Amino acid sequence: MSDKASTPKKSATKDATKPKKVGDEEAKKREVKKNFDSYALYISRVLKSVFPDIGITLPSISVMDSFVRDIFERIAMDASSLTRNYQKSTLTTKEIETATKLILKGDLNKHAVSEGQSAVKRAQGQPTSGSKSR
């Protein structure tokens, strides 16, 4: 019994003697950054492009980030439900537009739909008519 008590556990000796790689810590940092989704950078960039002289505080960015996430999740959930209800396997711009109409009301809906349509046209390489370039 004294032999077993005096010998260290194999896993403890492997961990202690195992040399650490230089890239291990950097890889962990990159993993953390990958998993953290935030719109804060984009919110501040859009604000600076629209109003160059105005700044925004970190709590305000946090509120805006939460708002954007919430709206995104709502639109995604409604669009997904519409796709399932229509018994389709592909989510199209039609479902996104319909979900947006269900969530946003009034002028906000009109602006969101028109901006979304112009963004889709730009992505497809079609010229957009009547849209403002910022």
Curated annotation (Swiss-Prot):
Recorded GO cellular component terms are: nucleosome; nucleus
SMART domains in the record: H2B
- Biased-composition ranges for Polar residues? 1-10, 125-134
Q: Name one GO molecular function term.
A: protein heterodimerization activity
Major site of localization recorded for this protein: nucleus
Q: Where is this region: Disordered?
A: 1-29, 113-134
Report the SUPFAM superfamilies cross-referenced here.
Answer: Histone-fold
Quote the subcellular location field of this record: Nucleus; Chromosome
Q: Basic and acidic residues: which segments have biased composition?
A: 12-29
Q: Does the keyword DNA-binding apply?
A: yes
- Its domain of life reads Eukaryota
Going by the UniProt record, its keywords in alphabetical order are: Chromosome, DNA-binding, Nucleosome core, Nucleus
Report the family membership: Belongs to the histone H2B family.
Biological role stated in the UniProt entry = Core component of nucleosome. Nucleosomes wrap and compact DNA into chromatin, limiting DNA accessibility to the cellular machineries which require DNA as a template. Histones thereby play a central role in transcription regulation, DNA repair, DNA replication and chromosomal stability. DNA accessibility is regulated via a complex set of post-translational modifications of histones, also called histone code, and nucleosome remodeling.
Q: How does it assemble?
A: The nucleosome is a histone octamer containing two molecules each of H2A, H2B, H3 and H4 assembled in one H3-H4 heterotetramer and two H2A-H2B heterodimers. The octamer wraps approximately 147 bp of DNA.
- This one is known as Histone H2B
